Amino acid sequence: TPKYLNSPESSIFEKGKLLFAFDKAYKSIREEKQAILVEGYMDVISAHNHGVTNVVASLGTAYTRDHGHILMRQAEEIVLAYDMDGAGRQAAARAIELLQNTDFKVRVLAMPDGKDPDDYVRNHGGQAFKELVAKAVKPLDYLLSESLIKHDTNDTEGKQAVMADVFPYIANIDSQTQRDDALKTLALPLWLDNSTIFRYFRDYVKKGQIELVD
């Protein structure tokens, strides 16, 4: 059973061009210069009921560039607070991709214990949720932590898998300085020196694949 049921799309109702509760949230978003983007209606309703009013939802669909256009005049920062199930993780990864190299500051909130924002707010309250949002991390840190959970970096295959997960994001960073900094960040948990990670990255950009030597 789908978690969120929406009306069929039409010329009037286009999910990719609407943000649930934006009419109620935009003043808070403007004041705080931050929009918290969640997946579902109940996430928004619970947050607003507990005093966190800069929260909007993408109506059960992934983030789109049209959503960004809606938020552009109100927010400087977008915090992604999607569910931590498979669909939520995929939606977060897609949103990170679309938000990369935009004017928004972007952070990602990994909900603890697999809970969604609705569960968390109802159990812990609005202030606790705000404190959690304050700890949201940069997209690179989120993608890296997600990958490190899945792969054992003590062996070559694990290192290669982590690089395969994170290199596409780094390759799309416009700034050379930021790209170099991202590679240095990636090198640390892989126990690689900077020159090695740079070489693997150059090979990835040139060949589209990663070839590691034990």
Can you say where each PLM-predicted feature lies in the sequence?
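Phosphate-handling DNA/RNA-contact segment within nucleic-acid enzymes
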Residues: T1-Q74, I78, A91-A92
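A charged alpha-helical hairpin associated with nucleic-acid processing machineries
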Residues: Y26-A35, A62-I78, Y82-D214
